[in-house]
Design a protein with these regions (language model features):
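Rhodanese-like catalytic fold shared by cysteine-dependent sulfurtransferases
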Residues: 1-22, 28-60, 69-107
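Short, surface-exposed ligand- or partner-binding patches at beta-edge/loop junctions that are enriched
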Residues: 64
Length: 107
């Protein structure tokens, strides 16, 4: 199944729309302490199978991690279990920091 790969600019544009998408951060806690996108829901990748029922099914979900690999795997899993509007932040929070918010720490 194909998952939409959104650039940081596309994600920024999506955040201005209604309904606003849910930003799902699947990084580890120590990574989240370094930086995160405002308003994100944090569920580490390894807990997604146990907690995906906490996610809304009536708004788009944009999944992100550090570079976009873990989040792509989570997005594929969410689509597999029935979520219909799931996308991946291409390049992860690293790309976001480089292209949208240069004040965000890089790691």
């Amino acid at each position: 199944m194909s998952i939409a790969q959104l650039t940081p600019q596309q994600v920024q544009d999506c955040l201005k729309k209604q309904p606003a998408p849910l930003l799902l951060d699947v990084r580890e806690e120590d990574e989240v302490r370094l930086c995160a996108l405002p308003g994100s829901l944090h569920i580490p990748m390894n807990l997604i199978p146990l907690r995906h029922n906490e996610l809304p099914d009536d708004v788009p979900i944009i999944v992100y991690c550090h570079h976009g690999i873990r989040s792509l795997n989570v997005a594929r899993y969410l689509a597999h279990v029935g979520f219909e509007n799931v996308a991946n932040l291409q390049g992860g929070i690293d790309a976001w920091a480089r292209q949208i918010d240069p004040s965000m720490p890089l790691y």
